[in-house]
UniProtKB/Swiss-Prot annotation:
It catalyses: 2-C-methyl-D-erythritol 4-phosphate + CTP + H(+) = 4-CDP-2-C-methyl-D-erythritol + diphosphate. It comes from Salmonella paratyphi A (strain AKU_12601). NCBIfam families: ispD. Pathway: Isoprenoid biosynthesis; isopentenyl diphosphate biosynthesis via DXP pathway; isopentenyl diphosphate from 1-deoxy-D-xylulose 5-phosphate: step 2/6. The record marks 20, 27 as: Transition state stabilizer. GO terms for molecular function: 2-C-methyl-D-erythritol 4-phosphate cytidylyltransferase activity. The record marks 157, 213 as: Positions MEP for the nucleophilic attack. Its EC number is 2.7.7.60. This is 2-C-methyl-D-erythritol 4-phosphate cytidylyltransferase.
Length: 236
């Protein structure tokens, strides 16, 4: 029988640096308003009553996290992350070995809406595999010629989706798929790709396109706009 309305643990891989932000400070520690991007991302998870624990995987040399209020939050656990995202996620999964379902959320994705999170969590009522938040591709997509800045051809956008986070899976299934994929040298770009590698087909749960990941300098102002708009809407 599929699990129904069980408590959920979350893993946030936050050991990366994000060199495309062109800043000495890791992007998850840049501020939007009076909170860091990481705090916005984690608080969005903790705002849902089913999320009882968040494991944050940080770099072993990270001295910034200890200065945040999150460091003393009773629902937060910190573990050492690895060189790659998958290594950090596996470290987080080890810390929640008894959890049945886990969310994995980007440390630099601060604009998660509660209605999107609720719809993603609801799939645990009927799914044995899990799924991800995703946004349908609306722009015309071009594939470039290998090694060149020239168009090779237009890619049919029907059935193309932008993968977002959180991604939500049974803990044991995700652990086993990540472990197998890494052991066999598969290229893992997100958690869903590990399940795909092992022959599973996670669900696509349509989410809002403003659930952006802060990757480049211009993303910071856009994320601030989205967060400010959400705050104003909640107060209205």
């Amino acid at each position: 029988m599929a699990a129904t309305l069980l408590d959920v643990c979350a893993v946030v891989p936050a050991a990366g640096f994000g060199r495309r932000m062109q800043t000495e400070c890791p992007k998850q520690y840049l501020s939007i308003g009076n909170k860091t991007i990481l705090e916005h991302s984690v608080h969005a998870l903790l705002a849902h009553p089913r999320v009882t624990r968040v494991v944050i995987a940080i770099s072993p040399g990270d001295h910034r996290f200890a200065q945040l209020p999150l460091a003393n939050h009773p629902q937060i656990t910190v573990v050492d992350g690895g060189n790659e995202r998958a290594d950090s996620v596996l470290a987080g999964l080890q810390a929640v070995a008894k959890a049945q379902w886990v969310l994995v959320h980007d440390a630099a994705r601060p604009c998660l809406h509660q209605d999107d999170l609720a719809r993603l969590l609801a799939i645990s009522e009927n799914s044995r595999v899990g799924g991800i938040l995703a946004s349908p591709v609306r722009d015309t997509m071009k594939r470039g010629e290998p090694g060149k800045t020239a168009i090779a051809h237009t890619v049919e956008r029907a059935d193309l989706w932008h993968a977002l986070t959180p991604q939500f899976f049974p803990r044991e299934l995700l652990h086993d798929c990540l472990t197998r994929a890494l052991n066999e040298g598969a290229i893992i770009t997100d958690e869903a790709s590990a399940l795909e590698y092992c022959g599973f087909h996670p669900a696509l749960v349509e989410g809002r396109a403003d659930n952006i990941k802060v990757t480049r300098p211009e993303d910071l102002a856009l994320a601030e706009f989205y967060l400010t708009r959400t705050i104003h809407q909640e107060k209205a």
